[in-house]
A protein has these predicted regions:
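Active-site helix of classical SDR
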Residues: 128, 164, 172
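Residue(s) in the substrate-gating loop at a strand-loop-helix junction
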Residues: 148
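C-terminal substrate-recognition "lid" of short-chain dehydrogenase/reductases
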Residues: 128, 140, 220-249, 253-254
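Substrate-binding pocket helix/loop in short-chain dehydrogenase/reductase
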Residues: 103-105, 109-117, 212
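Alpha-helical segment proximal to the catalytic Tyr-Lys
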Residues: 133, 177-181, 240
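Short C-terminal tail/terminal secondary-structure segment
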Residues: 2-7, 99-102, 153, 232, ...
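Canonical Rossmann dinucleotide-binding motif of NAD(H)/NADP(H)-dependent dehydrogenases/reductases
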Residues: 8-40
Length: 256
C-alpha cells in the first residue's frame, strides 16, 4: 500500500471514521491515510486495531478508539481523544451501522427495532453532535453520513433500517442548513449494494447472488473502495460548494 498520490491532498488533516474496522469504513480509513490524513477509527469491533496497524506499518498515521456510537460518553471520548492526539478534527465519516434481522413489520420484535434505530440513527446524531462542537471551535470541517439507497426507496422486511436511513438523510440536510455559515459542510451518502462482510451471506448464497446481480444495471455490486472514493471527494475542496445533499452511488439502481 503506497501512501502517495496527487489526486487529493489531505496532508496534516485529521479524519474520524466510525465503523472503520471493516467494509466501507476500513476502505475509507485506508484511502484517507493514503492521501495524507491522520485517521482515527471508532468502532466496537477489535478489527479496527488491525486496520490502524496496517495503515501505520505502511507509512500512514492512525489510531483506534473502541467506541459504541450508541453511548454519548464514548462518542465524546472518541472526539476528545482525536483532538488530544492530533490537535483537531477536519473530517468525519459517520459510517457505523447494522442491518436488522429480516422480518415483516408486524412480526418485528421491538428490541430489534430499537437496536437498529440506536445504532443507525442515534449513533449518527451523537457523532454529529460532538464533531460539530469541535468543528465550530476550529473554524469548520466536513461531515459525511453514510445512509443508503434504503433512505430514498424502501425494501420489504427491513423497515427499521429503511426508517433509520431516511432519517439520517433528513438529519444531514437539517444540520447542513444550520451550520453552512459556520463553514461546516454536511452531506449524506447513499450507496447501493456493496460487497462487504455485512452482506457476505447474500453473496455466499448462489440463488441470492444471482438475483442481486440480475437486478443490478451494471451487473455487479460495488466494492468498498468505490464508496470510499466518493467519501474523499465530498471531503475534498473539489466539493467545496456541496452541502445538504444526498450523493447516490448505486450503479444506476435508482435510475429506473
Amino acid at each position: 500500500m503506497a501512501l502517495n498520490s496527487t489526486q487529493f491532498n489531505f496532508a496534516d488533516r485529521v479524519a474520524i471514521v466510525t465503523g472503520g474496522a471493516t467494509g466501507i469504513g476500513r476502505a475509507t480509513s485506508i484511502l484517507f491515510a493514503r492521501h495524507g490524513a491522520r485517521v482515527a477509527i471508532g468502532d466496537l469491533n477489535p478489527e479496527g486495531a488491525k486496520t490502524t496497524e496496517l495503515i501505520n506499518s505502511n507509512g500512514g498515521e492512525a489510531l483506534f478508539v473502541k467506541t459504541d456510537v450508541r453511548e454519548p460518553e464514548q462518542v465524546k471520548n472518541l472526539v476528545a481523544t482525536v483532538v488530544k492526539t492530533y490537535g483537531g478534527l477536519d473530517y468525519a465519516f459517520n459510517n457505523a451501522g447494522i442491518l436488522p434481522v429480516a422480518a415483516p413489520l408486524a412480526e418485528l420484535e421491538e428490541a430489534r427495532f430499537d437496536e437498529v434505530i440506536a445504532v443507525d440513527l442515534k449513533g449518527v446524531f451523537l457523532c454529529m453532535k460532538y464533531e460539530i462542537r469541535q468543528m465550530l471551535k476550529s473554524g469548520g470541517g466536513v461531515i459525511v453520513n453514510n445512509a443508503s439507497i434504503a433512505g430514498m426507496i424502501a425494501d420489504p422486511g427491513i423497515a427499521p433500517y429503511v426508517a433509520a436511513k431516511h432519517a439520517v438523510i433528513g438529519l444531514s440536510k437539517a444540520a447542513a442548513l444550520e451550520y453552512a455559515r459556520q463553514k461546516i459542510r454536511i452531506n449524506a451518502l447513499a450507496p447501493g449494494l456493496v460487497e462487504t462482510g455485512m452482506t457476505k451471506h447474500w453473496f455466499d448464497d448462489p440463488s441470492i447472488r444471482g438475483a442481486l446481480m440480475a437486478n443490478s444495471p451494471m451487473g455487479r455490486a460495488a466494492q468498498p473502495e468505490e464508496i470510499a472514493g466518493m467519501v474523499l471527494f465530498l471531503c475534498s475542496d473539489f466539493a467545496s460548494f456541496a452541502t445538504g445533499q444526498v450523493f447516490v452511488v448505486d450503479g444506476g439502481y435508482t435510475a429506473r
